[in-house]
């Protein structure tokens, strides 16, 4: 199973093609729209969110509410395209006829963004040729793919949820004593998608302060997946390890700078006796762990405990009090360019990381249990659970 996305931030639309879903997966388009709306929400978002009202359109692969087994093509329109038709026109253009369009040319790269490296690599004179695709607007297409993946995982009893653990210097307390439903309920009631109400209020204050200063904020999101059977992934080769795939996928999200699974870097500072999860067995549960410091992964495979993964996101590169840069055509020092942007996109990043994680899990479920139809995959899944129960 894989997906591709296409589209620029201010182009006509974003397109996602998902290949490898079996036939017969029930699809709720309203659920995809809800995830798209969740991505657009969150305290600290910018003016673009007032323009876009993301809704998914199906171009292929779904009929009468179920997948066909053929590639699924999804489209999300960019409503802001109407304001950018000349700037983003695919037709040859000698000169802009609209003076406002000429002002959209970008020649001052932003520190922390793809602008300069992309211009050098692809030999672009206008940084817009880089920033349009590098923009996090592309993640709407990834959320559509991941939301579809969550619907594939649901019949297997697998659930995935993302929420915010920190923004700037404010860290939330771990959501102890709450099941996944309780965590989700608290997080979705928070303006910053944080299940800790006290920390949530302080995060809002930090975002307000950064906005006043013309600055931006990053943070850490946590994704939990429940209901995973042991044995997804493999220890046999590097590219079959689930933790490796998750790390690659999550680090590919715009502004992601670090990933840890379970106790992660904290475990590196402790002794083995304080890190590794002791194993137990009972007739009703089978094998289990007394703790979950490994975050549900050992040797590149799920071990039956909840998957817990955290992703660190740097502050957004666009600053309204810009840092030093240079004009790429003259090499003269100048303030970095400014694009319409968010102050903090960490609440949105929680949704994106949730959906990216869901797609990777769906990929490994499909690889493990196969099946050209959902029913065939579920039969294989049930057979595997019966095999495990006999151990």
From Swiss-Prot:
GO molecular function, one term: chorismate synthase activity
Record key words, sorted: Amino-acid biosynthesis, Aromatic amino acid biosynthesis, FAD, Flavoprotein, FMN, Lyase, NADP
Positions contributing to NADP(+) binding: 39, 45
Flavoprotein as UniProt keyword: yes
Cited InterPro entries: Chorismate_synth, Chorismate_synth_AroC_sf, Chorismate_synthase_CS
EC number, as in UniProt: 4.2.3.5
Catalysed reactions, semicolon-separated: 5-O-(1-carboxyvinyl)-3-phosphoshikimate = chorismate + phosphate
GO terms for biological process, alphabetical: amino acid biosynthetic process; aromatic amino acid family biosynthetic process; chorismate biosynthetic process
A single cellular component GO annotation: cytosol
Enzyme type, top EC level: lyase
Required cofactor(s): FMNH2
Pathway assigned in UniProt: Metabolic intermediate biosynthesis; chorismate biosynthesis; chorismate from D-erythrose 4-phosphate and phosphoenolpyruvate: step 7/7
CDD domains linked: Chorismate_synthase
Co-factor binding comment: Reduced FMN (FMNH(2)).
Binding residues for FMN: 133-135, 254-255, 299, 314-318, 340
General function of this protein: This reaction introduces a second double bond into the aromatic ring system.
SUBUNIT field: Homotetramer.
Family: Belongs to the chorismate synthase family.
Record protein name field: Chorismate synthase
Source species of the chain: Symbiobacterium thermophilum (strain DSM 24528 / JCM 14929 / IAM 14863 / T)
Gene field: aroC
């Amino acid at each position: 199973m894989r997906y591709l996305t296409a589209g620029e931030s201010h182009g006509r639309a974003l397109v996602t093609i998902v290949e490898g879903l079996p036939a017969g997966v029930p699809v709720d388009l309203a659920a995809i729209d809800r995830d798209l709306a969740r991505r657009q929400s969150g305290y600290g978002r910018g003016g673009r969110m007032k323009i876009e009202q993301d809704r998914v359109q199906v171009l292929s692969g779904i009929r009468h509410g179920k997948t066909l087994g053929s590639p699924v093509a999804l489209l999300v329109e960019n409503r802001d395209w109407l304001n950018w038709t000349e700037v983003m026109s695919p037709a040859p253009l000698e000169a802009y006829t609209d003076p406002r369009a000429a002002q959209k040319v970008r020649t001052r790269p932003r520190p922390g963004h793809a602008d300069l490296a992309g211009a050098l690599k692809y030999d672009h004179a206008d940084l817009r040729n880089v920033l349009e695709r590098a923009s996090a607007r592309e993640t709407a297409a990834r959320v559509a793919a991941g939301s579809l993946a969550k619907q594939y995982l649901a019949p297997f009893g697998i659930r995935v949820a993302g929420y915010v653990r920190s923004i700037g210097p404010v860290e939330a307390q771990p959501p102890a004593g709450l099941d996944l439903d309780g965590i989700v309920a608290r997080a979705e009631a928070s303006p910053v998608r944080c299940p800790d109400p006290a920390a949530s209020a302080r995060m809002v204050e930090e975002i307000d302060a950064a906005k006043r200063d013309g600055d931006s904020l990053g943070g850490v999101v946590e994704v939990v997946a429940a209901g995973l059977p042991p044995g997804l992934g493999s220890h046999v080769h590097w590219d079959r390890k689930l933790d490796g795939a998750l790390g690659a996928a999550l680090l590919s999200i715009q502004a992601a700078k670090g990933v840890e699974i379970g106790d992660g870097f904290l475990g590196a500072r402790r002794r083995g006796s304080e890190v590794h999860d002791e194993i137990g067995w009972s007739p009703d549960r089978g094998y289990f762990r007394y703790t979950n410091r490994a975050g549900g992964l050992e040797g590149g495979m799920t071990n039956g405990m909840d998957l817990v993964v955290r992703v660190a996101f740097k502050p957004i590169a666009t600053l309204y009090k810009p840092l030093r840069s240079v004009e790429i055509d003259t090499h003269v020092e100048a303030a970095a360019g400014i694009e319409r942007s968010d102050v903090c996109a960490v609440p949105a990043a929680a949704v994106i990381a949730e959906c990216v994680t869901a797609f990777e899990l769906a990929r490994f479920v499909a690889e493990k249990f196969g099946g050209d139809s959902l029913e065939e995959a579920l039969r294989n899944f049930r057979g595997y659970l019966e095999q495990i129960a006999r151990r």
